[in-house]
Regions:
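Active-site loop segments of alpha/beta catalytic cores
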Residues: 15-17, 44-167
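Short intrinsically disordered, low-complexity coil segments enriched in acidic
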Residues: 1-6, 163-167
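A contiguous, low-structure linker/loop signature
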Residues: 2-56, 75-79
């Protein structure tokens, strides 16, 4: 839970610290996946320092904007849904893709701990939003693949991610 802030801006790109604390470079004049260049969580020690940031609290949402968007969409008869990234997609924003993939293979218990914290946060966030708004649906997205295949084995998915996706 970090405020998004601009670190550097040029005519070609903007570098920001994004909401999970990661440093991202976004190109202005071309379409590209943001280039993530640094992460606050680099190992178990920095994970333990970071972990409390994945606790639910009322400041996680911009309630005024959420209410305005909700009411405007509702007045237009739109399909209203709660949506968030979960699992691999969220974890790569916290520790980075390369570090995450290596840890899936070499330190799965660490990744399970991060998944547990992330899942608890998303469940609490969903419950909080459902206590205030009425949704027509829910969408939990998780991008675990690259072009032609998954980023890790089905066995790793079953062992590490599936138990938390079920929750």
């Amino acid at each position: 839970q970090f405020p998004v802030r601009i670190i550097e801006e040029t005519e070609e790109y903007t570098i920001i610290q994004a909401s999970y604390g990661e440093t991202r470079k976004n190109w202005k004049n071309r379409i590209s996946t943001p280039e993530c260049t640094d992460f606050l969580v680099k190992d178990r020690k920095t994970w333990e320092e970071y972990k409390p940031r994945l606790s639910m609290n009322k400041t996680r949402f911009d309630w005024v904007t959420a209410r305005n968007v909700y009411e405007r969409a509702k007045s237009k008869g739109r399909f209203l849904y709660f949506s968030c990234g979960v699992g691999y997609d969220m974890l790569q924003a916290i520790i980075g893709s390369e570090r995450l993939l290596i840890a899936i293979a070499e330190e799965p218990e660490w990744i399970r701990d991060i998944m547990k914290s992330a899942t608890e946060l998303l469940i609490a966030a969903g419950e909080e939003m459902l206590s205030v708004f009425k949704f027509d649906g829910v969408f939990y997205g998780d991008d675990m693949g690259y072009r032609n295949a998954s980023l890790f084995s089905p066995a790793a998915y079953k062992e590490i991610f599936f138990p938390y996706h079920k929750k």
